[in-house]
Amino acid sequence: MAEIAPLRVQLIAKTEFSAPPDVPWSTDADGGAALVEFAGRACYQSWDKPNPRTATNAGYVRHIIDVGHFSVLEHASVSFYITGISRSCTHELIRHRHFSYSQLSQRYVPEHDSQVVAPPGIEDDPELLEIFTEAADAGRAAYTELLTRLEARLADQPNATLRRKQARQAARAVLPNATETRIVVTGNYRAWRHFIAMRASEHADLEIRRLAIECLRQLVDAAPQVFSDFEIVVLADGTEVATSPLATEV
């Protein structure tokens, strides 16, 4: 029987920052948040912090976001390794073209034992889940049979790697959209804010909304000055959304 893969989001990389020693400036932050402030101050050479309201890093970054000077957010980035996400969800995810992606290849990785991601609305209903897993099992069985026959048909291909790749790329056509995939996603702070604003909305598909909420939680930990204006709230149906009055790029 098909196994259900739980969503897992792991932060694997984030920006480090080293201030130039010849610039007369310091800040109370580090990493990406410090880089954002440095980039903003570099535009105006305001190293002496003339405005008390923006003297702290948090105050400065909040002002940057409030006035819409979003370009300085593009200097800092975060990378996530995401597993337990369905192929159908990554088809939506990769529409965010300011991100960079590296995704599991079904041409090189066999899917005999692939897990599936149960859609919201099915995952908590035993009868629906049984129908779902039976369909997933049928798809995987068809994949395995096609793969075996295709490899036999391509036996004259002397290059074993090419033979396996050609068989897999044809057989994968019967795998369900719910098949689990794994993907590395890198984006700058501006791109992540846009993603959260678009996909943590109640109007987004629930699977990608869950992904956006989990990414947001880790982004707040990594750079609270940049992401803590988003508020996560629970709706009447028990699902979560995130909104911010400063999220104007949608």
From Swiss-Prot:
The signal peptide stretch is: none
> Reaction catalysed by this chain?
dUMP + (6R)-5,10-methylene-5,6,7,8-tetrahydrofolate + NADPH + H(+) = dTMP + (6S)-5,6,7,8-tetrahydrofolate + NADP(+)
InterPro entries, per the entry: Thymidylate_synthase_ThyX, Thymidylate_synthase_ThyX_sf
Task: Look up the record and name the pathway of this protein.
Answer: Pyrimidine metabolism; dTTP biosynthesis
| Domain of life from the UniProt record | Bacteria
Give the motif span (ThyX motif): 95-105
Enzyme Commission number(s) of this protein: 2.1.1.148
Q: Which GO terms describe its molecular function?
A: flavin adenine dinucleotide binding; NADPH binding; thymidylate synthase (FAD) activity; thymidylate synthase activity
GO BP annotations of the record are: dTMP biosynthetic process; dTTP biosynthetic process; methylation
Q: Which residues bind FAD?
A: S71, R95, H96, R97, Q103, N188, Y189, R190, H194
Pfam families according to UniProt: Thy1
- Catalytic residues at R199
**Alphabetical keyword list:** FAD, Flavoprotein, Methyltransferase, NADP, Nucleotide biosynthesis, Transferase
Free-text cofactor note: Binds 4 FAD per tetramer. Each FAD binding site is formed by three monomers.
Task: Please name the PROSITE patterns in this protein's record.
Answer: THYX
Q: Which residues bind dUMP?
A: E92, L93, I94, R95, Q103, L104, S105, Q106, R107, R172, R199
Report the enzyme's class at the first EC level.
transferase
The keyword Signal belongs to this UniProt entry's keyword annotation: no
Presence of the UniProt keyword Flavoprotein in the record = yes
- Cite the record's note on assembly: Homotetramer.
Q: What is this protein called?
A: Flavin-dependent thymidylate synthase
Top-down, what is the taxonomic lineage of the species of origin?
Bacteria, Bacillati, Actinomycetota, Actinomycetes, Mycobacteriales
